Swiss-Prot record:
GO terms for cellular component: cytosol. InterPro entries: Trm112-like. Belongs to the UPF0434 family. The lineage of its organism: Bacteria, Pseudomonadati, Pseudomonadota, Alphaproteobacteria, Rhodobacterales. Pfam families: Trm112p (PF03966). HAMAP family: UPF0434 (MF_01187). This is UPF0434 protein Jann_0424. Transmembrane segments: none annotated. It comes from the Bacteria.
Amino acid sequence: MSDGDTNGPTGPIDRRMLEALVCPMTQAPLSYDAEKQELISKAAHLAYPIRGGIPIMLEEEARKLD
C-alpha cells in the first residue's frame, strides 16, 4: 500500500483520486467520510457512496444530507 492510500472496508482508496474529484452538481470540493464510505458535498448537501472502492458520482445515487 502506498502513502497515498486510505483504507476503507473494501480496500485502499487512492487519496490522490479523492482529491481530484469534485461534486458533479456544483464543482465544489468533496470531503471523505471513511466510516460511511461516502464523499460529502457540503455545497450540494449530498453524500455520494463509494462501492467496492469506486466513487459513484451520480446525483440519483447520492444520499441527501439534512
